[in-house]
From Swiss-Prot:
Organism of origin: Conus pulicarius (Flea-bitten cone)
Family stated for the protein in its record: Belongs to the conotoxin I3 superfamily.
Protein name: Conotoxin Pu11.1
Signal peptide: 1-19
Tissue specificity remark: Expressed by the venom duct.
Keywords: Disulfide bond, Secreted, Signal, Toxin
Subcellular location as annotated: Secreted
Gene Ontology, cellular component aspect: extracellular region
Pfam families membership: Conotoxin (PF02950)
InterPro entries in the cross-refs: Conotoxin
Length: 80
């Protein structure tokens, strides 16, 4: 019984230390991402459904550009 309790205690301590490490890594990644965003080249912002576009790359995700009058729209066929 003492062996089982010791193993459970060790596993709990390992999970706590791993969780703290993951939180630290997340904070580090967030700070790095913010720095890159502020100091890096201007990021292009994609446009949602109906957003103005001239090329497919201006639209978010699976949206395709239907031209300036249509904007970004969903399409059943792949974008050109």
């Amino acid at each position: 019984m003492k062996l089982v309790l010791a193993i459970v205690l060790i596993l709990m301590l390992l999970s706590l230390s791993t969780g703290a490490e993951m939180s630290d890594n997340h904070a580090s990644r967030s700070a790095t991402a913010l720095t890159d965003r502020l100091l890096g080249p201007k990021a292009s912002i994609c446009r949602g459904t109906g957003g103005r576009c001239t090329k497919d790359k201006h639209c978010c995700g699976w949206l395709c550009c239907g031209g300036p009058s249509v904007g970004c729209a969903t399409s059943f066929a792949p974008c050109n």
